[in-house]
């Protein structure tokens, strides 16, 4: 029967091998609240061990987008899983939730155990760094759905926060300040444009881009995980709103965390722009304003705090080895929910 299934495009033995290869990676992400092990029909997590009075569950799901295509084309699969984790846990973190567990979904033309192991290694690396248990997942072999060598990767994360500590941005008010946490690079958005510019420029991706790092490694630098530094701030500073700067850049994401009646005023000269964005802008002849509508431009996550807490917040983030800047302030509402100052043509 296995041979018949294999002839139809599904190799169950390759699937078994992939599972065996990923077990050691998954195991290092486990938390004491996880019940049982791999292989069940469902994964269980004991919320009572969190010792929360009124726990609110927060969930998020996302993928990596066409950054995957760049990784696949250059046979580099060991960090793309970090991106999948980051895109989900950074999102739920904006509510003040601590990520608890993660599930991944890999769909592929053909299960190649070595490749699946590398993908799951990256997922496990991201989970381990954020103390998030990788409690389940699915690997689907669908030869008629994907071209040879191709796969898609998505994830689902669940976190928890005390109901009284849930952050939704509703109490943001004028006079508060915005703290920006540095990104690690492009993160996981805008890659349809990035790949187009790579192709048009005919750049040698193995050539050095900056400080001994190749173009390829620069473009595939994993999305930064903000969980540990932000939770460290949350323990000592009252946070009013948080934003994960993803697709749509500053213009689409920062207003999502603000109530009616206020405007976020951002000084783009208050933080450095990584060289990779300068390269993209030059190669694509892109207007500066549009760059902030596509990319994170060097700031991957923002916090809104009281002005009196700004220095303390920056100090905590420095202790967490995260570059951070006071990038703006909350003002009375103007015509737009966000205004960027210092933008050069």
Swiss-Prot record:
It is an enzyme of class 6 (ligase). One of its GO terms (molecular function) is ATP binding. Pathway: Purine metabolism; IMP biosynthesis via de novo pathway; 5-amino-1-(5-phospho-D-ribosyl)imidazole from N(2)-formyl-N(1)-(5-phospho-D-ribosyl)glycinamide: step 2/2. InterPro entries: PurM-like_C_dom, PurM-like_C_sf, PurM-like_N, PurM-like_N_sf, PurM_cligase. GO terms for cellular component: cytosol. GO terms for biological process: 'de novo' IMP biosynthetic process; adenine biosynthetic process. Keywords: ATP-binding, Cytoplasm, Ligase, Nucleotide-binding, Purine biosynthesis. Its EC number is 6.3.3.1. It is found in: Cytoplasm. It catalyses: 2-formamido-N(1)-(5-O-phospho-beta-D-ribosyl)acetamidine + ATP = 5-amino-1-(5-phospho-beta-D-ribosyl)imidazole + ADP + phosphate + H(+). It comes from the Bacteria. It holds the Pfam family AIRS. The keyword DNA-binding does not apply. The keyword Repressor does not apply. Belongs to the AIR synthase family. HAMAP family: AIRS (MF_00741). This is Phosphoribosylformylglycinamidine cyclo-ligase. It comes from Staphylococcus carnosus (strain TM300). The lineage of its organism: Bacteria, Bacillati, Bacillota, Bacilli, Bacillales. The gene is purM.
């Amino acid at each position: 029967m296995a041979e018949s299934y294999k002839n139809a495009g599904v190799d169950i033995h390759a699937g078994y091998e992939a599972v065996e290869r990923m077990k050691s990676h998954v195991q290092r992400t486990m938390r004491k609240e996880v019940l049982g092990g791999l292989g069940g029909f469902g994964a269980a997590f004991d919320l009572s061990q969190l010792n929360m009075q009124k726990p609110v569950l927060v969930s998020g799901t996302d993928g990596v987008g066409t950054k995957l295509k760049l990784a696949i084309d250059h046979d580099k699969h060991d960090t793309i899983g970090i991106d999948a984790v980051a895109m989900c846990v950074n999102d739920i973190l904006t509510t003040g939730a601590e990520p608890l567990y993660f599930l991944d979904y890999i769909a592929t033309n053909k299960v190649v155990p070595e490749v699946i192991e590398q993908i799951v290694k990256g997922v496990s690396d991201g989970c381990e760094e954020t103390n998030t248990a990788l409690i389940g997942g699915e690997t689907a072999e669908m030869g008629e759905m994907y071209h040879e060598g191709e796969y898609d990767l998505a994830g689902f994360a669940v976190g928890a926060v005390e109901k009284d500590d849930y952050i939704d941005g509703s109490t943001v008010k004028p006079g508060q300040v915005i703290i920006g946490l540095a990104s690690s690079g492009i993160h996981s958005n805008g890659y349809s444009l990035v790949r187009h510019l790579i192709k048009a420029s005919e750049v040698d991706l193995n050539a050095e881009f900056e400080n001994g790092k190749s173009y390829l490694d620069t473009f595939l630098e994993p999305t930064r995980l903000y969980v540990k530094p932000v939770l460290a701030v949350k323990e000592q500073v009252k946070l009013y709103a948080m934003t994960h700067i993803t697709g749509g850049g500053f213009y689409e994401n920062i207003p999502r965390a603000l109530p009616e009646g206020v405007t976020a005023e951002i000084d783009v000269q208050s933080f450095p722009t990584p060289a990779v964005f300068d390269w993209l802008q030059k190669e694509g002849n892109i207007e500066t304003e549009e760059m902030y509508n596509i990319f994170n431009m060097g700031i991957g996550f923002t916090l809104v705090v009281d002005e009196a807490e700004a220095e303390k917040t920056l100090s905590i983030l420095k202790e967490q080895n995260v570059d951070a800047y006071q990038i703006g302030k909350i003002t009375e509402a103007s015509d737009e929910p966000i205004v960027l100052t210092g933008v050069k043509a």
